[in-house]
A protein has these predicted regions:
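Extracytoplasmic catalytic/substrate-binding loops of multi-pass membrane glycan-assembly enzymes
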Residues: 34-49, 60-76, 83-87
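Loop-to-helix entry region of an early transmembrane alpha helix in multi-pass inner-membrane enzymes
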Residues: 68, 72, 82-102, 274-279
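Transmembrane-helix motifs of polytopic, lipid-linked glycan transferases
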Residues: 91-113, 148-149
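Hydrophobic, aromatic-rich transmembrane alpha-helices
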Residues: 102-103, 274-303, 341-346
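Membrane-interface alpha helices of multi-pass inner-membrane proteins
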Residues: 126-128, 162-177, 183-188, 217, ...
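Hydrophobic/aromatic-rich transmembrane helices and adjacent perimembrane loops
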Residues: 181, 324-357
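Membrane-interface helix-loop-helix junctions at transmembrane boundaries of multi-pass membrane enzymes
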Residues: 198-210, 287-313, 324-327
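Short periplasmic/luminal acceptor-recognition loop of GT-C membrane glycosyltransferases, typified by
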Residues: 393-449, 458-463, 467-481, 506-514
Length: 517
């Protein structure tokens, strides 16, 4: 009894220590770069949604958005803090980051006995480096939490744990349906793996039924929204249908394989970084294939295998899909955590002569690839950032971002004063929360081509809002002419040309500015 009590005390102390470490790391990162950088693009997309939820609007129904969970999380914390500004949003995201980092470090610490503090510090540094970009910290943390859910099931596959694991998968899907899909795939593989050479209950069928019931319970917030929130069910299914229409979840980019690095035209630093990025992309696939083969082989031989390795093995390929869906470093960072967690858990149990050189190598590679992308580095000492005020907070941002913010404020003062609406399309959803305005258009981030019916509805919304000015960022995204706004939304573009007057003197030829006629 004493031994069991002592063991529980140790686990509680260990968890508390890791929570303190996780909080310290995130707090230190926030101090370093919380006031640095600002994106009118993706970060603005999240910020607009959080602001609109604070005002009573519903994600997906009232504005284009991610899945609802992250907006309600952000809105609740921002409401508690009495602030709807960008720093309040970043604070809400940072709290979620603490949860993700804690889960990751706790799983690594539990993967072997007597884990050293030095190893956990290195693991924390590696995970924190890859926690980028900050507006995607929900997604990164969810990928870590999914690993934890599967480990929870693998350690003790009881009936209750099948149900609870399913419930967690459903709840994860409230924050992101893609994570729910990845969690479902990983869960099915784990449940099949658990049945190998296993005679006790629950078997695969009963376990699956319990798990599926849990998924329904976990996803209940969205299911209830489809039943109780007027108009939500239609837009929810439309958002799913649209994915099948465009046949993609992202705009693809070529995979930056190591052999595609233009060694003759880049610096040594950039060449090394390019090779490392390509190797990490290969690693996400290679780890998934070899780890699955390893854990299945060990299972057939009835040999023990670390639960973290099993969980990461079956999540690696689903998350590699996300990394490859738009093959840049930002999406690699969101899909790499099964690889990182699997490697860190595997190395933790190795002899010192293998563990330490390997973890230092992983740390160095992560530092080389990721450090230059963090806002704290980009606006650090000697970097050319300028100070601007955004929602009552002083931010250090790149000069072009400051120029864009100044332009939007100038246009609003001249053409849309006293809270009058405006349109900023297709890439600047952050313009609306920046100026505390509601977007006339539902589609605040207009990346994909839309059909005639959709465009006509948007035109009616623009007509009803009577915007004072419209700014069209005429950019061929990824160098693709078909992705210019006039090609993805030709009816809306023609409506603007027919009903608004061009404003001369644009600071950038790509910024097509129109004022109300």
């Amino acid at each position: 009894m004493f031994s069991k009590h002592q063991g529980n005390r140790f686990k509680t102390l260990q968890a508390s220590s890791i929570l303190v470490l996780s909080s310290f790391v995130v707090f230190a990162l926030f101090l370093w770069q919380g006031h640095k950088g600002f994106s009118l693009w993706d970060e603005g997309y999240l910020w607009y949604g959080a602001q609109r939820v604070l005002l009573g609007e519903v994600p997906l129904r009232d504005f284009m958005s991610y899945d609802p969970g992250r907006y309600y999380w952000s809105a609740v914390l921002m409401s508690l803090w009495g602030d709807n500004g960008i720093m309040a949003l970043r604070g809400a995201v940072a709290v979620f980051q603490v949860i993700g980092l804690f889960a990751g470090l706790f799983l690594i610490a539990r993967s072997t006995t007597n884990q050293s503090l030095a190893y956990l510090l290195l693991a924390a540094a590696i995970l924190a480096l890859w926690m980028f970009p900050r507006h995607k910290l929900f997604d990164i943390s969810l990928s870590i939490l999914l690993i934890g859910v599967l480990v929870f099931l693998i350690r003790q596959p009881t009936s209750m744990r099948y149900f609870l694991a399913g419930m967690c998968i459903g709840l994860v899907a409230v924050f992101g349906r893609n994570h729910g899909v990845y969690g479902v795939l990983g869960s099915l593989c784990v449940m099949a793996w658990l049945t190998i050479g296993r005679a006790d209950q629950p078997g695969f069928i009963r376990g699956f039924m319990l798990w599926a019931a849990g998924v329904i319970v976990g996803f209940a917030p969205v299911l209830l929204m489809t039943l109780l929130v007027p108009g939500f069910v239609m837009v929810f299914w439309e958002s799913i249908r649209f994915l099948f229409e465009v046949k993609a979840t992202n705009l693809p980019l070529p995979v930056p394989w190591p052999w595609t690095v233009p060694f003759g035209s880049v610096s040594v630093d950039e060449a090394i970084r390019g090779v490392l990025v390509g190797l990490f992309f290969i690693g996400t696939i290679a780890f998934g294939i070899f780890a699955i083969a390893w854990v299945v082989w060990k299972k057939f031989r009835r040999e023990p295998v670390a639960p973290v390795l099993v969980a990461t093995a079956f999540l690696a390929l689903p998350y590699a899909h996300y990394a490859y869906s738009r093959a840049d470093v930002g999406h690699l960072a969101q899909g790499i955590f099964p690889l990182l967690m699997g490697c860190l858990a595997l190395l933790a149990a190795q002899p010192a002569r293998i563990k330490w050189p390997s973890v230092f190598l992983l740390s160095g590679a992560s530092l080389w690839v990721m450090l230059v992308l963090h806002p704290g580095w980009q606006c650090g000492a000697g970097k050319h950032c300028v100070s601007i005020e955004v929602s009552g907070s002083e931010l250090n941002v790149a000069p072009d971002t400051a120029s864009n913010v100044h332009l939007l404020r100038k246009l609003a003062d001249e053409y849309a004063p006293h809270g009058r609406s405006f349109v900023a399309a297709p890439f600047w959803p952050g313009a609306y929360p920046l100026l505390a305005r509601k977007s006339p258009m539902w589609e605040i981030y207009a990346l994909f081509p839309r059909n005639e019916v959709f465009q006509q509805l948007e035109i009616e919304r623009i007509r009803a809002a009577n915007p004072g000015f419209i700014l069209i960022y005429d950019l061929s995204l990824d160098g693709r002419e078909e992705l210019r706004f006039r090609n993805t939304h030709p009816l809306i573009h023609q409506y603007i040309l027919d009903n608004f007057e061009p404003v001369p003197g644009s600071p950038d030829p790509a910024y097509q500015i129109y004022k109300s006629a």
